Amino acid sequence: MFKTRLLSGIVLVIIAFATIFLGGDVLFVTLLIISLIGVSELYKVVKIEKAPLGIVGYIGVVAYYFLIRAQKKEDLMMFAIILLILVMAVYVFAFPKYVSEQVMTAYFGVFYVAIMLSYIYQTRLLKDGLFLVGLVFLCSWGCDTCAYCVGVLIGKHKMAPKLSPKKSIEGGIGGLAGAALLGALYALAINKWGGASAGVGEYALICFVGGIISMIGDLAASAIKRNHEIKDYGKLIPGHGGILDRFDSVIFTAPVIYYLAVALM
């Protein structure tokens, strides 16, 4: 199991960084596909992945991505309103086929998965975006890895025993310290070998804050699974589960990195 998880994790990291490096349409299409799969995993939890209500959500994901591709940010509020009206229209005209939880999930899923993940693409468009996008994955997966290692070594006090019994406060602190250190080392590396002019302190701060948010994202995904008594969202990634199992922290971190980069850079 560990070997499978390690190998698939290495492949995932290689694919992620190759896609980020290429950027443009490759990154756009990849994120669109990942978002659609992630939304379908969430919809499967409430059994609407193949229902008309779910199809409205998928259409919403595609429409949203093409809005940001065309840089039509001024139309996003109108998009949110139209999507809400369409979801509620399916609800009332099919009543009582769907319960309110399914309806709210159909709408929520577009925001939780697609809109949050789209900030990876939007961050890539920023000045030094190639380097900044790396922070999304560095602070998410880096914090998780450091937290796991520290937790195994010295973890004693449970962070959220009802959600994730294996996570410890000591591991969380180690994860944040590790994320900040990785951010600083990353800045030094891209300055030396990538021709960047990244601020070491700024990158460390971004990764520290991103690490906090990544833990919230991880626990939020766990809470949904606990509520519905499921172990994983899917089986797409061997040893890891589904898209939401692997990208749960990235979903929360991506928009935070974007806005911190805009504010600090």
Predicted regions and their residues:
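Membrane-embedded alpha-helical bundles of polytopic integral membrane proteins
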Residues: 2-209
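Short helical (or helix-break) motifs at transmembrane helix termini and adjacent helical loops
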Residues: 141-152, 214-226
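Re-entrant/interfacial helical elements at transmembrane boundaries that shape
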Residues: 152-153, 223-229, 251, 255-256
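Hydrophobic transmembrane alpha-helices of multi-pass small-molecule transporters
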Residues: 179-180, 246, 253-254, 262
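Hydrophobic transmembrane alpha-helical segments of multi-pass transport and channel proteins
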Residues: 208-216, 243-251
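Interfacial loop-to-transmembrane junctions
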Residues: 226-249
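Juxtamembrane boundary at the C-terminal end of a transmembrane helix
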Residues: 259-265
